[in-house]
Structures are given as C-alpha cells and as structure tokens.
C-alpha cells in the first residue's frame, strides 16, 4: 500500500480490499457476505476562520446512485441455445467463453442435478473474464425435491437412507455432508471472485400447510458465508398474512427473496409477479419464466413449460422493474428462464439494450467459428 492510499485509509476507515471497517474501526461485512450494504463515506471539507474542518458523514450509497444490474440466462448450454443462438460449429467447450462475450453473469442449472467436480469449476473460471459472475443452483436434495440416490455424490450414495420408492431421505447428517461437498466445489468460484449467489429453488411440495420455514435454518447457517437466494415455488408462501412472515424470516436471516415474472394465474405453483421484495439490500433477484399460463401448467418438458417469447413492450416493463429494484439494492440479477429455442438469450440481449448496456454484435459469418 503506497503512502497516498494508506493516508486515505487512515482518514476514512475505508479500503477497497475484501475486509472493511467503518469510521470508528468497527468491522463491516466482507465482499459477498449476506449482510447490509456497506455505506460510502462522504467527506465534506469547508473553510472557517482560516482552518479546515472536516465533516465526515456516513451516507447510504442508495441515496446517491442506483445499483448495478446484471442480466443473464438460466444456463448457457440449453439445447435451444445450441440450435438457434450459438454460432454453427462451435465446440461445447467454447460455448461459455462465447456466452461471456454477451453477458456478465449466468445462472448455473446443472448443479441442481449433480455437484460439479473441481476440474469443471476451474474450467468455468478460466473460460470467463475476471468480472464474470456465476449464480449457482443448489443441489435438488437441499432444495427439498424428491431425489434418487444416483444423483448424490458417489461417496454419499451408499450411506443415504431411501424410502420404498428409492428416494433419498434428507437427514441432518446427509444435509451437512452434501452441503460441505457442494461448498468445496464453490470455493473455487469464491476464490476467483466469481461466485454470485447460491440459489435454493424450493419444491412446490414445500408448502406452509405442511412445512415451516424454520426447517431451512440449519442449511441457511451452513451457507452463512455465501449470499443465498431462495425461490419459492408454492405461491402460498407469498400471499395473504403468510407473505409478511416469509419476508420477515428472510430479512432476519439475510436471505434474498427471488422475485418472479410469470403468467397471471393463481395456480399454487405460480408465484405472484406483482412483488418487488428486497430482503437483503446487498442484492435483489428477478427470474423471468415467461407468461404462457397454459404452457407453464401443461408443459411436460422445460422447453414446453417456458415456451414464451417476450414482446418488446414486455421487455420495457422488465427494464423498469429492474431499475426500481436497483434503486434499493446494491446489485440486481435478472435471469431469463424462458428456455425454449433461443428465446432467453435474445430476451436478455434486448433487456441489456433497453437498460442502455453494451450489446455485442452477433458474428456476421457464424459458420467460421
């Protein structure tokens, strides 16, 4: 640290590293911790009777500038992307690097089905720019989905208890072991500064009628060093009096509520789209599933369920909603999950344009890639 930066640190108590203190020397949250936003220090200097007096005011950054908006898609290897969006002839190992030329973040979907090995995660890091962000879905068993033993890491399969249908029972010991293995893989992203949030996408069967949010506290505690976003897939968590209890729970635990854009229907699996909740002012999350109610309810595959191409008018609505969230959050992640054909990457590109962000031009001769 040079003399100028050292003097700045001593004067303000603020550094650009991973550990911060406020003006009184108290520890502030580390980068990436699920906590309240770090305040910036506004230093006002004025002259009085030939003497300089310094007034140091802790000013919430939200009052002076909006948060950063990152736009991406839920996966980079969806079959529709390969067929319609990527350049023809591009190799599987080249797709992520090409994706990263167009977007600053991606939501990893494959981790829902299996824990990636260290070599795979290391390749993700090497194939993306330094500032790229990975939001990562937690394993489906941690998300309270019905899970066959074969989808567990090999070292856990033979020890897992199963029911009569061969589905794994989520015991405290298994939850801890699976979480530790998952976090070891994520430590590579974390060490590279590329880990965004861990996404807990709860099963629709996890309902307030049968379950209590306190059941998640053990997992939340194990993930305390990461930013955790929770997507409810049962709308009963987000309506009536239950909504306030849900939001209060997330705020107490500094977990991030996942806001949704979905069809205007009241089926229990469709979350309401009129919520813009920010439960951790470090980050707001918005996932877009499309607005095709019939496809959403009847689709037998992901491509069929999320078969929706956002119109320009709807993209403009999403842009305004993203800006509203950015007014009260340090960062906003907007993820298109309408993964049919190339709908998601095209919608994400159009949203970046609507937000005034840089849009990479598609290659003129994709056959050459």
Residue spans for each PLM region:
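Short, low-complexity, charge-dense intrinsically disordered segments
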Residues: 3-7, 12-22, 28-31, 37-50
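Intrinsically disordered, low-complexity regions enriched in polar/acidic and amide residues
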Residues: 35-36, 62
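Residues lining hydrophobic/aromatic ligand-binding pockets adjacent to catalytic sites
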Residues: 54-369
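Intrinsic-disorder/low-complexity regions
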Residues: 1-3, 18-21, 59, 336-339
């Amino acid at each position: 640290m040079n003399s100028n930066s050292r003097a700045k640190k001593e004067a303000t108590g603020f550094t650009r590293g991973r550990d911060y203190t406020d003006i009184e020397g108290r520890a502030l949250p580390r980068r990436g911790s699920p906590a309240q936003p770090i305040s910036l220090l506004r230093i006002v200097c004025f002259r009085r009777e030939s003497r300089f007096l310094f007034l140091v005011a802790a000013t919430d950054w939200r009052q002076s500038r909006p948060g950063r908006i990152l736009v991406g898609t839920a996966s980079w290897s969806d079959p529709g992307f390969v067929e319609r969006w990527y350049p023809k002839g591009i190799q599987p190992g080249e797709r992520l690097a090409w994706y990263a030329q167009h977007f600053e973040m991606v939501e990893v979907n494959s981790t829902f089905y299996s824990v990636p090995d260290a070599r795979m995660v290391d390749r993700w890091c090497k194939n993306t720019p330094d500032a790229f962000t990975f939001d990562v879905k937690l394993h489906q068993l941690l998300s309270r989905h019905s899970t066959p033993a074969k989808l567990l890491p090999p070292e856990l399969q033979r020890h897992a208890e199963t029911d009569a249908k061969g589905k794994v029972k989520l015991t405290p010991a298994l939850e801890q072991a699976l979480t530790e293995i998952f976090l070891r893989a994520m430590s590579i992203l974390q060490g590279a500064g590329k880990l965004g949030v861990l996404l807990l996408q709860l099963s629709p069967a996890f309902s307030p009628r049968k379950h209590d949010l306190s059941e998640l506290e053990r997992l939340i505690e194990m993930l305390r060093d990461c930013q955790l976003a929770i997507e409810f897939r049962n709308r009963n968590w987000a309506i009536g009096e239950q909504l306030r209890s849900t939001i209060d729970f997330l705020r107490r635990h500094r977990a991030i509520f996942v806001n949704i854009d979905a069809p205007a229907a009241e089926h229990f699996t469709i979350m309401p789209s009129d919520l813009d909740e920010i439960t951790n002012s470090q980050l707001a999350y918005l996932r877009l599933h499309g607005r095709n109610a019939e496809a959403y309810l009847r689709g037998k595959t992901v491509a069929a369920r999320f078969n929706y191409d956002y119109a320009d008018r709807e993209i403009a609505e999403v842009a305004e909603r993203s800006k509203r969230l950015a007014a009260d959050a340090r960062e906003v992640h907007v993820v298109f999950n309408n993964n049919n054909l190339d709908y998601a990457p095209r919608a994400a590109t159009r949203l970046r344009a609507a937000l005034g962000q840089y849009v990479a031009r598609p290659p003129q001769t994709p056959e050459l890639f």
